[in-house]
Amino acid sequence: MTTNEIENTERVTSIFEAFGRGDVAYILDQLADDARFVSHLDPIVPWAGEFSGKDNVARYFQALGASVDVTDHPVNAVVAQDETVVATGDVSFSVRETGKIGSSSWVYIFKLANGQVQSYDQFNDTGLAEAFR
């Protein structure tokens, strides 16, 4: 693993740690100003879609935080190649609107440049959307 890949892996790991603490400000500080988050999710999920720029990415986190209570978010693997970091894991949560308890496996793809996240793509299995129905 190159020094750059190690640094990128550490950066993404620190983002997961901040998410666990609810520290969205830290996460936003790790992003490029024009960062792009894309949640490839069923439109029923409030944070599905594309969010470009830090202000819009902040809205992504607001929608997520207003919609669900995350009870567990283990990261199973973090793998880096060049400027790309891929992470896999699971999430357990409750949906505030429906009261349903849900779980989902996920894959997140981060692209970094100069130590900042340029893009993030989120993929979850159907368990996430089902909890919103």
Segments (PLM) and residue ranges:
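Short, low-complexity N-terminal intrinsically disordered segments enriched in polar/charged residues
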Residues: M1-D29
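Short, conserved loop/turn and helix-capping segments at secondary-structure boundaries
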Residues: I6, F51-K54, S104
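A beta-strand edge to alpha-helix "cap/lid" segment located at domain peripheries
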Residues: T2-N4, Q62-R133
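Hydrophobic alpha-helical core bundles mediating ligand binding, dimerization, or RNAP-core interactions
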Residues: V12, F16-F19, L31, F61, ...
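Short charge-dense sequence patches
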Residues: I6-E17, R36-L41, V57-F61, D82, ...
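A solvent-exposed, acidic/Ser-Thr-rich amphipathic alpha-helical stretch
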Residues: Y26, A32-A80
